[in-house]
Amino acid sequence: AGQLSLVGTGVRDELFRQVLLTPADVLRRHSQYNETSYSDFAMADAARRGIPRPMLPVDARSLRLDLLAGGGADALAFDGTGLFQAARGGYGGSLVVLGNNQRIEIVGAGAQASEGFQGVTLRADDLNAFGAARMVIGSTPAVLYGQGGNYVTFDITDGAQSIVLRNGAELAAPEVFLLANRPGEAISLEQGAAIVTLGRGAAAYDARDGFLYASGGRSMLALSNGVLNVLPPEAGTPDSGPGDILLGVPAADGVAGETRLYSEGSLVAATDKRFVLDGSVRYGTRNLTLAAGGFNVGEQALLAELAERGVLPTGLALDQQVLDRLLQGDASEGAPPLETLVLNARDAFNFYGDVSLDSYDPSSGRSRLSRLVLGTPAIYGYGDSDSVASIR
């Protein structure tokens, strides 16, 4: 006997009924059925909708840690084995670390919270020890199945004001995301800090699986052994929105060193505020993406004059010197040579006066890139009738 009920609710019959249970093999002898597993149904449904497949039983899941400020570097310690590996054909699991909308700092082995720091302190070695296929710090990634099911978005109810990777801290995973959502704050990597994905294995999933990342009103720094397609961030408000991305800032302890960013697939910086790539930064990757509110292309002196007059739109300044710095990939630590530079603008590309962006190496006569990709809803040119803007 049994009671009929609605699954997941407290609604059920008061009276018991007679229930007959028939084994599946016996039932198949009584009639003929077209049977399909959940995984096969989900794959077929996703193909019909033209979107990536949903989560399947072969996929590993996510571990989410929501930490409170004031606990010091000893608030999180991990000396175990994380089981984030997927079954064959599945997506690897993720480690998601949140700071209860506080500031987050990540320090090196044995280090304590920085003097005067008010926020969540974590040691990089403890985060690396989980062995996750994807490490996300500052927000929770989500994919809503159905229309728009190819967008990886981030939960608007959680976030971090800022994230700083201190001197001596190195994050290592197949894929690392840092996200912050407070204007006036920053995602900062000090001199001597590093994010390295080389030799860590495959990312959980990437653009080749049909996914597109949308950071929303957040700044984002990401390194991956896969291919990342990233939309520009949305415009924020005075209290919530993208902040700066500062790579290679002087260390709080005064110790100088190189900031290292190495991946086998992609390096992405997304913000509509300041983006600083200091001379101390060494990076190597196959695909470099800058996603910004806009790009202002022209000589630095002219752009500075326009900004002083208050007529320069918000955006990242770009000239030949900046382009040359972006093309200085470093393959000395085993990273692949740079192949693709992607510049995605939310608003527009603005060209001022006579300007040229040249990817060719003067010594060899060959382009330092296989692909230069510009993504923008509009391209504007400002100058007189003789002004020429060129990209080569």
Model-assigned labels for residue ranges:
Residues A1-R392:
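Extracellular and secretory-pathway beta-repeat/beta-biased strand scaffolds
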